[in-house]
Amino acid sequence: MAQAQIDEQRRLQDLYVQLKKEINDGEGVAWLFQQKTYTDKDNKPTKATPPLRTTSSDLRLCDCNKQHQHNQSNCWMCGNKRSRRAT
């Protein structure tokens, strides 16, 4: 029992380290908003994921990247410090 708990804890720690590495090597949390494609049973693409829908007033188009959205002068995804864009 104790060995199984140790193995599970080690596995979770390894997954956490892998996640941190992938986020640091990528674009921060921007990977959460990347568009994915649907695939059929033959693993062939069928159509693009529908656009992200939100009612949050904090999200608007960013000058730096049209794939993510925000309403802040400091873009938390890409570090863009330019003023916000009117929508």
Curated annotation (Swiss-Prot):
Subcellular location, record wording: Host nucleus
InterPro entries: ADV_NS1-3 (IPR020960)
Keyword field contains Transmembrane: no
Main location: host cell
Entry keyword set: Host nucleus
GO CC annotations on file: host cell nucleus
Function noted in UniProt: Plays a role in viral DNA replication.
Protein name as catalogued: Non-structural protein NS3
Organism: Aleutian mink disease parvovirus (strain G) (ADV)
